[in-house]
Amino acid sequence: MLETEHANTEVHELCRQMIARIEKYGTLEGFSDSDILEVLKTIKEILEPLPCLIEIIAPVVVFGDIHGQLGDLLQFTNEVGRPPDFQYLFLGDYVDRGPNSLEVTVWLFCMKILFSKKVHLLRGNHEVRRVNTMYGFKEEMMRKRNSHLWKVFNDVFAELSICASINRKILCMHGGISPKIESWDSLTGMTKPRVHGDCEHGLIVDLIWSDPNRKDDTIQFNKMRGISTLFGKSVVDNLCTTLAIDLIIRAHEMKEKGHTFEFDNRLLTVFSAPYYSGHNSNLGSVATISKSLKLRIVTLKPNKGYDRSKLDKRTLHDFEKNFQPLDENPRKNISCQFNVPPNGQKMSPFLGEYSMFAHETQFCKKDNETPVKKPYSSNQDEDHSVLDMIRKTQKGYGVEVSLKDKVMSLESIRKKLGMTTSTTPPPPRTPSPDAPLAQSPPIPRSPPSSTENA
């Protein structure tokens, strides 16, 4: 018993060190393959006994696709708060596309080890060996580590749960729902798809791969994916009635605003990778659900005004060396912010919060101050030239913040839908292009990769 406790203490300390290194430098350099294997061994032991359907009690923050975009992941956690004070549910697709799939996954695993009751991880379609062989994770692992570690990561992915319920009122998964779900027993009776082929048939393939059918209400083969099905509004309505739930939350698709409500607000798609693949102008969102099941969206807005191709190698090198970590004890902050990324990548200023109906918003005013130009310096203690150059690229970006008393609960939404089921909520207001940006610490960002769906 003492040996086990001592071993756990050592692993926990290793996880803390890895998290600190990842958040400060965006890398795992300095840690051996054996260190990573120790984390993988521990997380596998934690995940193995978990069922396919995990039960969660609100409050919780729900994350969509991450896709190796480490900086955006850290910025989200910096804004919404961190465990043990806050609970997380991740809907999958941690790897591929972005450059930091390794660091994102290790960060998530370490957080799960340290806060096993507060961090919940689901499996996405990119946590399938065949998929992450083709879309970047294997290549990244071969470049940073070795193929053996890539195989072990996929063994751990096979132990991830498939779906989650929040207070038995909200059902969450990566892909979508299935007409094969007849009751809660259909979900609790699933077996984890530990063999690759098990991910490609039955109920599980739909939970990982399916998409909404926005053209008509029929169930069709998902031609775009080449696998699984498309489900319509009637399937959503029937499932909500059958399971007595109010909302379904899924990920799997890039959304321009970072999220979308569909089918009388019973289906929410959330996508947490802003400026996806570096070529899109999409926002990224997470959903926060309070203890009373009040729903709020937190969104990151990408910045088009900064391109790594405009920086010379000397400036990039100094910028990387001067990278600073996020706050160790972040607090929720909905004020105007601006995040300077390392490596000259696209910037993601924090857009703010608003309720699902975005009833009222307030905007910051445009900052007309002209920054003072300072000479280039390679001194690690002075990064003025880089920051000045970035400030010159700014044109002013909107920061939208909700009024907190405008957030609606799921119960009030249900009552409203019961009165006027044909009424749809007004779309969120377009953020002002003339808002100012306040300075905040830099964070890592992902480079261009692909514009395909998650």
UniProtKB/Swiss-Prot annotation:
Mn(2+) 1 binds at D65, H67, D93. The keyword Manganese applies. The lineage of its organism: Eukaryota, Metazoa, Ecdysozoa, Nematoda, Chromadorea. GO terms for molecular function: metal ion binding; protein serine/threonine phosphatase activity. Residues 424-447 have a biased composition (Pro residues). It is an enzyme of class 3 (hydrolase). Its cofactor is Mn(2+). This is Putative serine/threonine-protein phosphatase C27B7.6. It catalyses: O-phospho-L-seryl-[protein] + H2O = L-seryl-[protein] + phosphate; O-phospho-L-threonyl-[protein] + H2O = L-threonyl-[protein] + phosphate. It comes from Caenorhabditis elegans. The active site is at H126. It comes from the Eukaryota. Mn(2+) 2 binds at D93, N125, H174, H252. Its EC number is 3.1.3.16. GO terms for cellular component: cytoplasm; nucleus.
